[in-house]
Amino acid sequence: MDKKEFEKEIKKCFKNVNQKFFDQIETYKLFLQEKNEQFNLTNLSDEKIVYAKYFYESLIPYSEIDFSNCKNVLDIGSGSGIPGILLKLIHPNIKLQIIEATGKKLEFMKQLVQKLGLDGVI
């Protein structure tokens, strides 16, 4: 799944996504690829795999959930921020709480949250 396919499919499943979301996803992907070796986050051998496996397949299970009354989301073992950061990008009004035991992955998450300019992430 390339970037255009990803955008097309996400727009079908999440009616509230806008260009800012896709810009943040691109920033996320590039930062993930840049920091992957340093933080040992995940296998990022192919851009199509990143869009299909890490982003699309991580978001689709949440496409049928109504987040309009949801105020808090807890992501346990967040690792590289999936699915928590993805949900925060789609639903910016939620408060995201991240629990990650690995220090270097937690440091990555702190840097990512700052890079994406996200508020309401603990």
Language model segments and positions:
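Class I SAM-dependent transferase core
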Residues: 5-70, 74, 111-121
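Short, conserved acidic/polar surface loops in the N-terminal third of protein domains
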Residues: 86, 110-111
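Conserved SAM-binding motif I beta-strand of class I
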Residues: 95-101
